[in-house]
């Protein structure tokens, strides 16, 4: 049984039974390779969301007009990636089993793997749309196969060649870029090519998992993240891209890599909250 959370994201106050979208938080950052703190992202987004309006002038939609249940954060074992991923996957399976849309709040990007496992088990021929500063395609990081630096490589092992569509990538090892050129639909640096990719996915009528690493944003907009990379996209470019992706059959999604304590101004958390609001409104049917 999934119980209501004490503190919810603004406007996400529906019951589990009546909701079409379910938020679930994964406060995990144990494989962070540079600056930790993403485990505090989900709770910070909830707390600071009350500085937002529920209404989006970008989409002329309001969170009060859609049904979202916030199930809160999972209790995860910080010392075991396998155990944490298993718990996240079970929660995603429970949400999917009830016919709801699972929207995961990270946490570091490794948590996406658990959600993809659950969603791919329900939706064959799954495609993944990936916004990020980093390719995340290493086969291992310092010998670890389960790392935020390897998450899309592990996802590739699930969905296969041509099923991962990557945008905004501007950092990684040479081998990652070479792997991407052979095995993924790779669009470095910007969102160029996104509209064509979306047209193709709509024509194929395939299910899509949508993962947003917030470090796709430029650090001038979003400095509060574990591995900031100069040369990112703007906030408005990201919002336009989210609305474009929402035209496909999105069956699961996540927003990850906010490390709120790394930005004392609070701007990064405010930005993450606004991204989540826009994503919720874009995917709500």
List PLM regions with ranges:
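Conserved alpha-helical scaffold segments that buttress catalytic/binding sites
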Residues: 2-285
């Amino acid at each position: 049984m999934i119980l209501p959370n004490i503190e919810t994201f603004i406007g996400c106050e529906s019951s589990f039974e009546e909701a079409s979208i379910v938020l679930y938080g994964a406060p995990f950052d144990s494989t962070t390779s540079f600056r930790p703190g993403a485990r505090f992202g989900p709770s910070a987004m909830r707390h600071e969301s009350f500085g937002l309006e529920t209404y989006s002038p970008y989409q002329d939609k309001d969170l009060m007009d859609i049904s979202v249940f916030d199930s809160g954060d999972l209790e995860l074992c910080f010392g075991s990636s396998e155990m944490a991923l298993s718990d996240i996957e079970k929660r995603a399976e429970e949400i999917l089993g009830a016919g709801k849309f699972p929207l995961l709040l990270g946490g570091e990007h490794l948590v996406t793997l658990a959600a993809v496992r659950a969603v791919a088990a329900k939706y064959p021929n799954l495609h993944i749309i990936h916004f990020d500063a980093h390719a995340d395609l290493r086969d291992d990081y310092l010998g670890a196969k389960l790392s935020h630096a390897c998450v899309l490589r592990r996802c590739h092992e699930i969905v296969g060649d041509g099923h991962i569509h990557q945008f905004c990538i501007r950092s990684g090892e040479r081998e990652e870029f070479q792997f991407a050129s052979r095995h993924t639909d790779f669009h470095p640096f910007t969102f160029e090519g996104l509209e064509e990719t979306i047209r193709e996915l709509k024509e194929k009528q395939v299910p899509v998992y949508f993962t947003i690493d917030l470090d796709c944003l430029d650090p001038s907009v979003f400095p509060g993240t574990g591995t900031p990379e100069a040369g990112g996209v703007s906030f408005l470019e990201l919002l336009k891209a989210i609305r474009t992706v929402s035209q496909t059959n999105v069956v699961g999604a996540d927003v990850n890599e906010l490390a709120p304590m790394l930005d004392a101004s609070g701007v990064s958390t405010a930005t993450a909250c606004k991204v989540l609001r826009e994503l919720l409104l874009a995917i709500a049917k």
